[in-house]
Amino acid sequence: MDSLCLNSGLHGVIPAITAVGNGGCGGVVEVRATASAPSQKRGPFGFSFKYPLTPFWSRGGGGGIASRRRSGLCLDDAVLVDSGDSRKPIAEETAVEMDTERRNGSWVLKILDVQSTWKHEEEEDDDEVEDEDGDEDEEVELDDAVVSEDDGGCDVCSVLEDDGNEANKFQLDRESFSKLLRRVTLPESKLYAQLSYLGNLAYSISKIKPANLSKYYGLRFVTSSAEKTESALKAENGEVSGETKPIVEAEEEVEEEEKNKSRKISASAAYEIVASAASYLHSRTNNILPFNSSSKAENSDKHDVNLTNAESSSDVAYSVTSVVAAEEDVKQAVADDLKSTISSPCDWFICDDDQSHTRFVVIQGSESLASWQANLLFEPIEFEGLGAIVHRGIYEAAKGMYEQMLPEVKAHIKTHGTSAKFRFTGHSLGGSLSLLLNLMLLVRGEVPASSLLPVITYGAPFVLCGGDRLLKKLGLPKSHVQAIVMHRDIVPRAFSCNYPYHVAELLKAVNGNFRSHPCLNKQSMLYSPMGELLILQPDETFSPGHELLPSGNGLYLLTSDFESPDIEDSDEERLRAAQTVFLNTPHPLDILSDRSAYGSSGTIQRDHDMNSYLKAVRSVIRKEVNQIRRAKREHRRSLWWPILVARESGSSGIAVSNGQINGQDFSGMMQTGRKSLQRFSRLVASQHMPLIVVMLFPVKLLFLGAFNVFSFR
């Protein structure tokens, strides 16, 4: 999923803009390219704007219209897909062959694909004189919008007052943060492992073998997005003949090759540009980080921005910003394309557990061009007329997938009636889509709340503002949404980290929907966490531990601390503060400023990949199972120990009550006899009779028996 971008100037606006300063609601200050941003209590941010942020970047050479409009550097945390082995289903490792070239595709080049689809929109504005006039008009409109925002109330003041308030109120370190963590039980971990396995399969749906799915997990494969798309295309256009289809595919391959040749930026060069941009911005804003993730941030190297690749980086930056700041008719065209029932922005598949009558809907993350368009159209709109605010691009994509899946939902209810259950899950963008689809089925009356099992997401961005309030309004508990987040995954932090004040003002300037966005105005974030937040920490050999979490791997539920609340509702406030601190530690800018974060072997890929989630959950289960086995072994030894003590006492001439011995023997046999009988039956069945003596009798008991025999002789 998703991207974080910073651009270097306002698209279509002269470098000086009028914005509300920190001196009060009525104050107006002028921000210029040579002036630093007003000092506010805020965190750093990397995100995408069509109108770049001029004060952050200096630019040498050429200052024409084109250079003013396409300046900026893009910071993106896309799902960097690795080669074959990283996404192989565990049960089918030897059978699945991944498409290496597709899986290693650069997220920057994927963004360039998005840019190419929007290029024709800019060709209409080639005349420089008309552009200059339009820029001046737009400047007046934006300035008026910023100034007039204070007429209805002091939203800016509330941003400044509320920003970081809860986090500062509750000082959280590792010790205090650990008190808010509860280890997930073994049955819950096994459920999460099963769903993470299905989420991993979603990236290779064409390779799924229904027989293996049934063998390992007892699930029956039902259908997939590929089958739905094929059926829709046949119904609309008719089936393509066998002779024509290869010709069409060949033409498409030629067009794709030409498109690739037209690109003037390589993945390695793009990573260098992005890392330089993030590092430079990190050095400029390091002193205003509200949640400093580590001491390394204070001692990080300050890299100079290399603007020799400005032409290439501007293509990337512009493609990221072109969607959210485009005209409404253009954005509506993208929305219509996203909710098309013919194609799906993310692949998905459905499988059934016939014993529990549960239908699993599994959705993959960002892979296609359509999914990237959904990511980039991040402006807020209302969700289903219920007052909650939602990410527009993902909401529009969910509408199209809703129409595709609805027949399968109705068919399952028709077959099983009130006993029908639905479990939605997904990774990255797929997790956000799973949540919206689940809620849409309930709101639209297609599925009762009793049939909807909790939604479980992996590394998914939060896409709702007022989500917890919406759950309460629908009569659902917070546990209905369970968001599993890798300890250093950048994607869940993308929309929920703290945004600087001036970035919030720029968002309001380029898109009117942000001006009344409550999360941005009062919490300095785009979309707030909702439901339950579960934190997954893998082994330290795989990824360094998190500074707020206990050492070692584990899966924790972040919950309220109910010990002696200081004030009313302090538990809920403490929980929100803990979520805020965690989602800003490390801050996305800290992650992006590290050059080792990029590429198929970078930390972004490592901490966000679905296969990493699967491996981490399974390692937690192994650790828990080993602890349980160790505890049972110690328990059995404690039950047999009195027998050994009694025999030793008898052999040394010490009198011991027979009733005491018999009672201890009887208690031990009652608690361990069944296990011993099971072991004995397995040994008999395997014809390993010589091992019975070794297995049934402890070593000490054998030595004592032998000693007694020799002593009598």
Curated annotation (Swiss-Prot):
Gene Ontology process terms (BP): defense response to insect; lipid catabolic process; positive regulation of defense response
GO cellular component, as recorded: chloroplast; chloroplast membrane; chloroplast stroma
Name under which the protein is recorded: Phospholipase A1 PLIP2, chloroplastic
Transit peptide: 1-32
Catalytic activity reported: a 1,2-diacyl-3-O-(beta-D-galactosyl)-sn-glycerol + 2 H2O = 3-beta-D-galactosyl-sn-glycerol + 2 a fatty acid + 2 H(+); a 1,2-diacyl-sn-glycero-3-phosphocholine + H2O = a 2-acyl-sn-glycero-3-phosphocholine + a fatty acid + H(+); 1-hexadecanoyl-2-(9Z-octadecenoyl)-sn-glycero-3-phosphocholine + H2O = 2-(9Z-octadecenoyl)-sn-glycero-3-phosphocholine + hexadecanoate + H(+); 1,2-di-(9Z-octadecenoyl)-sn-glycero-3-phosphocholine + H2O = 2-(9Z-octadecenoyl)-sn-glycero-3-phosphocholine + (9Z)-octadecenoate + H(+)
GO molecular function, one term: galactolipase activity
Family: Belongs to the AB hydrolase superfamily. Lipase family.
Stretch list, region Disordered: 118-140, 232-261
Induction: Induced by abscisic acid (ABA) and cold stress.
Superkingdom to which the source organism belongs: Eukaryota
Ranges annotated as biased composition (Acidic residues): 122-140
UniProt membrane topology term: Peripheral membrane protein
Keyword annotations of the record: Chloroplast, Hydrolase, Lipid degradation, Lipid metabolism, Membrane, Plastid, Transit peptide
Short motif GXSXG, span: 426-430
Function comment: Sn-1-specific phospholipase A1 that catalyzes the initial step of oxylipins and jasmonate (JA) biosynthesis. Hydrolyzes polyunsaturated acyl groups preferentially from chloroplastic monogalactosyldiacylglycerol (MGDG). May function downstream of abscisic acid (ABA) and provide a link between ABA-mediated abiotic stress responses and oxylipin and JA signalings. In vitro, possesses broad substrate specificity.
E.C. designation(s): 3.1.1.32, 3.1.1.26
Active site positions: 428 (acyl-ester intermediate), 489 (charge relay system), 608 (charge relay system)
SUPFAM superfamilies (alphabetical): alpha/beta-Hydrolases
Further remark: Plants overexpressing PLIP3 exhibit stunted growth and accumulate anthocyanin under normal growth conditions.
Cystine residue pairs: none
Subcellular location: Plastid, Chloroplast membrane; Plastid, Chloroplast stroma
